Amino acid sequence: EIYSCDWSSDVCSSDLNACIEKSPLFTQGEIPRLREFIKKHLKQGDHKEVLYLIENGRIRPSKSLQDCISSMLDGNQEFTMLDTQKVVFEEILYMARLCQKDKRKRVMIAKGGSGTGKSVIAVNAVVNLLKEDMFGQYITKNAAPRNVYINRLAGKMKKNKIKSLFAAPDKFYQQQPNDYDFLIVDEAHRLREKSGMFQKGENQIQELISSSLFTVFFIDPYQRVHFRDFGSISEFQKQAQLQNAEVIQYELHSQFRCNGSDGYIAWIRNMLQLEETANFNFKDISFDFRVIDDPNELRAMICEKNDESGKARILAGYCWEWEKAGRSDPNHDDIVIGDFKMSWNLDAGDPYAISQGSVHQVGCIHTTQGLEFDYVGVIIGEDLRYENNELVTDYRQRAKTDSSVKGLKKLYRENPEKAKHIERQIILNTYYTLMTRGMKGCYIYCCDSELQKYIKMSIADA
């Protein structure tokens, strides 16, 4: 086996020793070792036939991986699709098969708001395409969904068996054109222009489209929450056109989070001044939304809900430092509001969303975006206030450990108008995302008393 990647720590795991003995494995940086292996086992020439087979061989998912994933989704309620989601799912399968048949590059853009089932469709598509002998991966910038899905899908299997199905978008600048049959990109609004802290590559979107015969982008424009977030429908279209790829677009309308209330989603967008929407009556929905005056009361309510299902969490805007010294200490208090004290999520163990004790820690946008709970308690920090009859965003109230606003200070010096627009988008989208993580309810507490009053009035007026 030859792997042109730098995942040697995974593929060379001691768990795979027996397999590697039968099928020698070479990873990036081991060219001299591969050269010696070829010299040893190919004693005479064959008119370059072996080299041709290596160069033109098609990468396929292994039989053991296909056997492993065949039962992963069976009976798993969290990945069960509804009829409206199945329409997009079936179209993905059809387009992927068509690409295999005519070898034409295609890009699908699927737009959908919170709770429309983007991730459910994405995971189902990856599993089913692999079962059809196609080679591809589930891609997302945010590590939280990847880690949670690996845990939930693995079940009793070793996680290493399915870990290779999930990847970040940072390595594709190293790939050759059409190395993959398909790539399913979830949370595509979080893609960056360049990769990693060293800004490698040219354009992540261009690199993903180039690397795959068929690329699917799932996007929610209201969930761009980082200064460097680059993914947009217009950029997907532009990069697809530059590579002569056919573009197919879908929009997912019905949402199944927030007790299926499209009205609640619309109200949140309207209340956060993201867009003007028609008001609705809170009495008409069963979603449990409340404004709580004391963060200690909010914590007690969420703990009570968590006792029922294990799926309730407290989330907050990133306005408190995540101190390095306390990241593994559950008794370290990062967030202090009067006599209310809690720590941010711990930097160890299981992913925050499914860790057994994480109800006693506070999650942020980076540990919860792309995931859902039954109930969420959201603490809105001083980065969002209500002054002079309007919402005011203030990136200076964000913690220094929050990288999502890095770059704004410089941009404010160069282009204040653009900086203000991006700042507002980041902060409002962050709270929109946090407030739409709950399936059954959302309780909020605002550090700014005027914002607390504004939201209460918005409920009364609805």
Walk through the language-model features, giving the residues of each.
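Single conserved hydrophobic/aromatic residue that forms the stacking wall/gate
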Residues: 2-11
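Interdomain "pre-motor" coupling segment immediately N-terminal to P-loop NTPase/helicase cores
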Residues: 10-67
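Conserved helicase/translocase motor-coupling segment
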Residues: 122, 226-231, 245-266, 273-390
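C-terminal accessory regions
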Residues: 216, 361-365, 369-462
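Hydrophobic anchor at the beta1->P-loop junction of P-loop NTPases
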Residues: 110
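Conserved lysine of the Walker
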Residues: 118
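N-terminal pre-P-loop "Q-motif" helix
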Residues: 62, 77-106
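Conserved P-loop NTPase catalytic core
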Residues: 158-305, 310
